[in-house]
């Protein structure tokens, strides 16, 4: 008896040549319904329609097509079970040997902004049911859920009877496919209706096995979405991205995004941003009237730490900028676009990883941030809210002048991306000293102020958290700091305010903290 394949696919890539091979090489009969049946019939492939096979018409506008005992009985019947054999004979079932199913494009539909009812109609019911039935009975039935599996299935079939390990692998991929599908639906409903869920479920396909993790003795894997984020970025040259590269690129790009992001020169004057990052901390940042100037200003902050770092831009990289980039050793450069001449200049550095990350590849706002802990996962909103300066409060007798306000705004945006406790010293829209990851705030201030040195005169200071004591203000005064920005909220805020008034320093409370761990 000829084997029977049930074929119902949304993604019709390679389905015609695959079905032809099944028929010509292995004498399969093809059972199909709806759009897939029409697609195959149009290609002159003989098809048994599901409605004829079950002797039941499609109903409810196509919502019910394959949900039938003749379909699921034919898939779920165990070939060596005597009771199953009797049921097959009694109910006149025909055994189905291969299930080829992929599902309605739910993710694509909702990503395109579909309305609620349209999205609901793109929730596949029959497809997942057939996939799960076949995967459960994988000892007797093979299940294919992706066009990438077709060729391998044909090759394995040519070897004779399919091995149990291969069929188990197909079952694993099938259950992962339906789990991914259900996850997309449940997360969409949660977000659309702004519901709190008792379970946190996400699904990411494997993108790549990385060479190693943070250290060579650690295994590492990269999972992610195919149509957004770093997996969709175009790597124009250089070695494969490492685990540490990806972490640093994420931090660097997140920082420059504070100042806008565009492939073309559409930024406001003096909003061309460049950030140099090392070990997940900015070691230099600037905004200026060109990408080239912004990079040079950022480099001045800490040229030693910049060696082997990551550089991010929020605008096109031109040849002037590329000339300066090629003069130092860098791991990666990321920007929304690159001039052809700039690429020619940078390509002399063959190991330099160059990434084009377009604006369209940026994730939507309001994503989640996760961290694993023993036996669990911590989930929070990402710290990407756009603050309104009108919500800030000047708490001192002296108000900051226009230039100081510009620098305070800049320093505050950079400080948000520095590991806590974080202090950033800025002047003329560039960082001149950064104190990162210290266990006490005054310690971070000492590092940042010492790094800036004599440049501190008339500079500003930003702190990601409040001052528990007035000692940071005293230290800032010793170096010539003229303005401070911090969240406020300490029980001893008044002591810091009084010290600022005594020393002639202006201070702003943002009323929002930006701890980063």
Swiss-Prot record:
Its EC number is 2.1.2.3, 3.5.4.10. One of its GO terms (molecular function) is IMP cyclohydrolase activity. PROSITE patterns: MGS. Residues 1-145 form the MGS-like domain. One of its GO terms (biological process) is 'de novo' IMP biosynthetic process. Keywords: Hydrolase, Multifunctional enzyme, Purine biosynthesis, Transferase. It catalyses: (6R)-10-formyltetrahydrofolate + 5-amino-1-(5-phospho-beta-D-ribosyl)imidazole-4-carboxamide = 5-formamido-1-(5-phospho-D-ribosyl)imidazole-4-carboxamide + (6S)-5,6,7,8-tetrahydrofolate; IMP + H2O = 5-formamido-1-(5-phospho-D-ribosyl)imidazole-4-carboxamide. Disulfide bonds: none annotated. Pathway: Purine metabolism; IMP biosynthesis via de novo pathway; 5-formamido-1-(5-phospho-D-ribosyl)imidazole-4-carboxamide from 5-amino-1-(5-phospho-D-ribosyl)imidazole-4-carboxamide (10-formyl THF route): step 1/1; Purine metabolism; IMP biosynthesis via de novo pathway; IMP from 5-formamido-1-(5-phospho-D-ribosyl)imidazole-4-carboxamide: step 1/1. InterPro entries: AICAR_Tfase_dup_dom_sf, Cytidine_deaminase-like, MGS-like_dom, MGS-like_dom_sf, PurH-like. GO terms for cellular component: cytosol. Belongs to the PurH family. The IMP cyclohydrolase activity resides in the N-terminal region. This is Bifunctional purine biosynthesis protein PurH. It comes from Prochlorococcus marinus (strain MIT 9301). The lineage of its organism: Bacteria, Bacillati, Cyanobacteriota, Cyanophyceae, Synechococcales.
């Amino acid at each position: 008896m000829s084997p029977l394949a049930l074929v119902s696919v949304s993604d019709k890539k390679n389905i015609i040549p695959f079905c032809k091979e099944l028929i010509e090489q292995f004498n399969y009969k093809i059972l199909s319904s709806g759009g897939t049946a029409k697609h195959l019939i149009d290609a002159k492939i003989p098809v048994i329609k599901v409605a004829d096979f079950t002797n039941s018409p499609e109903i409810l506008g196509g919502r019910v097509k394959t949900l039938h005992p003749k379909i699921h009985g034919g898939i779920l019947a165990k070939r060596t079970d005597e009771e199953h054999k009797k049921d097959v004979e009694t109910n006149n079932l025909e055994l189905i040997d291969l299930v080829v199913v992929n599902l309605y494009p739910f993710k694509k539909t909702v990503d395109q902004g579909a309305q609620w009812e349209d999205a609901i109609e793109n929730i596949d019911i029959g497809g997942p049911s057939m996939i799960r039935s076949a995967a459960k009975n994988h000892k007797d039935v093979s299940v294919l859920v992706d066009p990438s599996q077709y060729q391998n299935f044909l090759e394995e079939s040519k070897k004779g009877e399919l091995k149990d390990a291969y069929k188990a692998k197909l079952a694993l991929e099938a259950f992962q496919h339906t789990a991914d599908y259900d996850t997309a639906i449940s997360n969409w409903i949660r977000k659309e209706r702004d519901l709190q869920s008792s379970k946190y479920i996400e699904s990411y396909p494997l993108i790549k096995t990385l060479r190693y993790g943070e250290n060579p003795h650690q295994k590492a894997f990269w999972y992610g979405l195919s149509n957004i984020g770093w997996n969709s970025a175009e790597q124009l040259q250089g070695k494969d991205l490492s685990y540490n590269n990806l972490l640093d690129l994420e931090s660097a790009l997140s920082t420059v995004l504070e100042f806008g992001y565009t492939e073309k020169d559409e930024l406001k004057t003096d909003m061309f941003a460049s950030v140099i990052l090392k070990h997940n901390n900015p070691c230099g940042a600037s905004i200026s009237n060109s990408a080239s100037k912004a990079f040079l200003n950022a480099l001045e902050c800490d040229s030693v730490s910049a060696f082997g770092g990551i550089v991010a831009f929020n605008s096109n990289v031109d040849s002037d900028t590329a000339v300066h980039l090629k003069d130092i050793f860098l791991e990666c450069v990321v920007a929304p676009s690159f001039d052809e001449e700039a690429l020619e200049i940078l390509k002399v550095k063959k190991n330099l990883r160059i990434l084009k990350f377009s604006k369209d590849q940026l994730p939507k706002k309001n994503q989640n941030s996760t961290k694993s802990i023993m036996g669990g996962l911590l989930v929070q909103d990402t710290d990407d809210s756009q603050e309104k300066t009108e919500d800030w409060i000047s708490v001192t007798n002296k108000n900051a002048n226009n230039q100081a306000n510009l620098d305070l705004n800049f320093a505050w945006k950079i400080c948000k991306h520095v590991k806590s406790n974080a202090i950033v010293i800025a002047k003329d829209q560039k960082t001149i000293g950064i104190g990162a990851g210290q266990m006490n705030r005054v310690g971070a201030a000492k590092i940042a102020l010492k790094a800036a040195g004599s440049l501190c005169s008339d500079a500003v200071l930003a702190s990601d958290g409040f001052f528990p004591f007035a000692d940071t203000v005293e230290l800032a005064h010793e170096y010539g700091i003229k303005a401070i920005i911090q969240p406020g909220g300490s029980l001893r805020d008044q002591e810091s305010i009084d010290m600022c008034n005594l020393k002639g320093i202006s201070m702003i409370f943002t009323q929002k903290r930006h701890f980063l761990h």
